[in-house]
Amino acid sequence: MASEEASRNSRSRWEPEGRFPRQDKYSVLLPTYNERENLPLIVWLLVKSFSESGINYEIIIIDDGSPDGTRDIAEQLVKIYGSDKILLRPREKKLGLGTAYIHGMKHATGNYIIIMDADLSHHPKFIPEFIRKQKEGNFDIVSGTRYKGNGGVYGWDLKRKIISRGANFITQILLRPGASDLTGSFRLYRKEVLQKLIEKCVSKGYVFQMEMIVRARQLNYTIGEVPISFVDRVYGESKLGGNEIVSFLKGLLTLFATT
């Protein structure tokens, strides 16, 4: 009996029964644009995952003037779950992903920041794994990866999979980032690390995520990885178009020339 008690006490506070340290708080930044159909479900899944794991959290919704009523849905979610758990911090118009994170961090009270897509491409069930990984290695960043272990992509046609794999391969060759999924956007950061990286980054749009990892390598931040399943959005239209692809290629060449 005594040995069992000693064994329980010797474990870290976050390990037993899936519980996590209450002194740590995790702020989820959810930038949204035309996500009225997806937002209620992703928030419900987040609340469920955090509650079941005993994780101290808040969800910050940064809506960029969505014309489809996303802001109205977000206001209802604040009433349902409480203003201490759901914070709506909207902006008047679409101003870019990087500035959305900056805006959200101004209101974040957690010592860790989680960034993810609001379109159900990233399942909150992986978040406890992110946290465990961070604790195990004391990492500055934990990144979800589609290209390692049992990670993968679901719902894409062959053409899009080839484009994604090709883009990731090229970035690995040119930038050598020290992470297997450079363009992913499901990550956990120490708050002060994310603040420092955003100060250093100059890219916008989809290139922003790529530059974050490249700058992290330059600043000698440690990166852990968790394999994830990326699922293509169920509702709404993808925001990745021709302009975004051109911007990605320009951004890649800029990073190659400056890092």
Curated annotation (Swiss-Prot):
One of its GO terms (molecular function) is dolichyl-phosphate beta-D-mannosyltransferase activity. Pfam families: Glycos_transf_2. InterPro entries: DPM1-like (IPR039528), Glyco_trans_2-like (IPR001173), Nucleotide-diphossugar_trans (IPR029044). It is found in: Endoplasmic reticulum. The modification Phosphoserine is found at S3. Its main location: endoplasmic reticulum. One of its GO terms (biological process) is dolichol metabolic process. Transfers mannose from GDP-mannose to dolichol monophosphate to form dolichol phosphate mannose (Dol-P-Man) which is the mannosyl donor in pathways leading to N-glycosylation, glycosyl phosphatidylinositol membrane anchoring, and O-mannosylation of proteins; catalytic subunit of the dolichol-phosphate mannose (DPM) synthase complex. This is Dolichol-phosphate mannosyltransferase subunit 1. The gene is DPM1.
